[in-house]
Amino acid sequence: MNGKFSKSASIIVFLLMILVLFGCSNQPSVTEDGRPILNGIMVKHALTKGFDEMEWLQEAEERAGVEIKWEEVSADWDQKKGAMLAGGDIPDIIVGANVITNADFAQFPGLFDDMTELIEEHAPNVQKMFDDRPEMRIIATQLDGQILGLPKYQRYWPETSTRQFINKTWLDELGLEIPTTWDELFDVLKAFKEEDANGNGNTNDEIPFDFSPVGTGGFGFFQPSVLLGSTGMTISGGGGQGYFVEDGEVKNFFIDERYKEVVSFLNELWKEGLINSEAFTQDYTKYQSTARGSGNEAKVGYTFGWELSDRFGTEVADQYVSIPPLKMTENSDIDVSWTYDYNQLNYGENMVQIASQSEHKEELMAFINELYDPVVSMQVLFGSIGPNIEENGDGTYSVLPPQDESMDPGTWKWTSTWADNGPLYIDDSLELELGEDMKSVGAQTEPLLPAFESVDPLRDVYPGLFIKYSQEDNNTLSLNNTDMMNLAMSNFSLWVTDGGIEQGWDSFVEQLKNMGLDENLEIMQGYYDDYINQLDE
């Protein structure tokens, strides 16, 4: 009897387990209104609010006939990505600014879907983007012709990320004019240091010149590499790893005599105590906070930044003005230039991907097509119509100030929406009045605009974003650049602070060449020539 009971109990338990498993495997896969429920990952800014609070996103999913369960990631993405890709278990859709890279596509072939046919059949907005801006198709297309990730274009950002600011109040207090040459800048900075420019009775608390911390991987925004523009050189991205284009030739400024002149000038400033003594040791937070002064008392005379209120805060920003690029000397007949960053600021690659194993690719492409509608893209970038954007009733729109008056517009944007991390296309036909912060950036860029008049962005700037290297060439470039930057950036800080560039120059150039610089230039020249030929077809 006990044996029969035990056997019956075992059968009942087994059947219950089957029912539980059956129930678990049949969780709702569609919404009540019949939309498939899909899985997605979005790598977002840490400030960005939950996606269920974004009106534009909920509306886009409904119009596309899907519901996406988003995993919102703002930290440790590289670690998560490595395990996810290696295991081959990816969600239906992944969104984020190049969070899946061309190298990932090469390393994990077949994991992501080729969207070419889906775009032709289900994404008229994406197709229009490709037709209107052929460079967008170039960015999206891999060497084998597949489209595995889609790009973005956000249109409104200026030609450069870096503006140079000087304290006009200090100049007026000392009876000085805005400098126009390196020599004049030297004299102004010396006066800032020695003549109590902020008028507080302490001649030792002014910082004549400060720039953003320089890393080991190359130059970036808000750094003194922009002074290369005084020599007529057009760099991009603040200089990066030194590559630039001049008269159709790919070059590297780390072996260019003009770079030596800039470093020598910076060394002269350093020797006179005119550069912040912490310039090479501070972090970016310190760089920003120092420029904001103390109350209405400014601390920094001349520096670089994105926008006045962003750089200096609300208390001292009105003391500063944006100024044009400097000439090397008064008699110089060189056409000055500046760092051209429009491509880095407005374009982005691999913003969204679809998993090849997804069973709902057409629905996913319908959703992606929604994102590339200009009115939706506007909301991806700046936030929803209503709280973030006003619809004016005549086909035009206006970005609204933050609802939280204590929050600056930039923070409000990143809090409200996907912002620069989202797939989007701001069509030239969209009529949108920008917020005050972007208007200010535009106005503060105006002194620099003449420097770009002779620059052909398609031919005079290395088109790194529009080029797909083979895996072999990419590996070669990466390995060579790592070695070269370790040497070049350590020498930059050494030569600015201790001098010695004249004595060490020839040996330095030879070392860079031995590390593979000539090989890199040859590779990049080939890709640049192919790109130009493609433009001319």
Model-identified regions with their sequence ranges:
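Extracytoplasmic/secretory soluble proteins
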Residues: 3, 24-537
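Sec-dependent N-terminal signal peptides of Gram-positive bacterial secreted proteins and lipoproteins
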Residues: 4-27
